[in-house]
Regions:
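Low-complexity, acidic Ser/Thr/Pro/Gly-rich terminal tails and inter-domain linkers that flank the onset
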Residues: 69-109
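Surface-exposed edge beta-strand/loop patches
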Residues: 2-66, 148-149, 155-156, 165-245
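A short beta-strand signature
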Residues: 109-126, 139-142
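Hydrophobic core residues within well-ordered beta-strands of beta-rich domains
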Residues: 87, 114-116, 183
């Protein structure tokens, strides 16, 4: 199962840029009319700007209200459309534990640590014919873990530092990839022991996506989550975790 955000990325990005351009030109006409004390130019510029902003806003909100929340099962892929190619994210493993780190210096959780292993893949089947084999650095990402009560948890710096002491490498979701390449990244969250129905949200961390029609970050749009239910446990020889309390 796969989901993509935003759908028809080249179209909606061009629509956004076109709306910005027309609005900017209209405002220049408005300013020209004000400077020349011309009511005609002022009305044309102001009316055009208001029409474009209102029309774009209605379309953006309409598409958002028609969206529905998605929770992808383990193994499902969430794609981010980078105009001429797609970067996919999928949960490949989960581990819950009360402490992380080497036996001589473990970091204990106030509740419990949840380690989520995410696979990041540059899907070579989604590139345009003219793209080539050059590396792509994904846009900035925001990551949170949510539970059944709507509580959100950011990655735990203490937990990730403890895991880093065991694994000896960190990496990030922003590592550049060539078409067909992939890597796995362990994300560590600290949650209360009563947290249930956990699901992972990975989304873009760019402010302009709020204004992109059909993007999950846009106003009133529903999110696409990666579910953790039935995820395989992370192999301990790869990521040795302390037993949970």
């Amino acid at each position: 199962m796969t989901e993509t955000t935003p759908h028809l990325a080249p179209v909606v990005v061009l629509l956004f840029l076109g709306a910005v351009f027309v609005t900017a030109v209209s405002l220049l006409v408005l300013l020209y009319g004000a400077a020349r004390r011309s009511r005609l130019y002022a009305r044309i510029g102001g009316g055009a700007a208001a029409t474009v902003v209102a029309g774009y806003g209605l379309l953006l909100c309409g598409v958002s209200l028609a969206s529905s929340e998605q929770v992808l099962p383990v193994g499902g892929w969430k794609y981010f459309c980078e105009i001429d190619c797609h970067i996919g994210y999928s949960v490949s493993g989960v581990e819950t534990t009360g402490a992380l780190g080497a036996e001589t210096g473990q970091t204990s959780a106030r509740g419990q640590f949840v380690v989520v292993r995410v696979k990041v893949w540059f899907d070579e089947h989604t590139i345009s014919r003219n793209r080539g084999d050059g590396p792509l650095t994904p846009n900035a990402r925001r990551v949170v873990l949510e539970d059944a009560n709507g509580r959100a948890y950011a990655p735990s710096p203490e937990g990730e530092a403890a895991l880093l002491g065991v694994k000896g490498e960190a990496g990030s979701l922003g590592e550049p990839l060539r078409p067909g390449q992939s890597f796995e990244k362990d994300l560590v969250f600290e949650v209360p022991k009563d947290a249930s129905a956990l699901r992972l949200l990975i989304t873009e961390d760019d402010p302009e996506t709020v204004l992109i029609i059909g993007h999950e970050n846009s106003l009133l749009h529903r999110k696409i989550y990666l579910g953790l239910d039935s995820a395989p446990r992370i192999a301990r020889e790869i990521s040795p975790l302390a037993p949970g309390h």
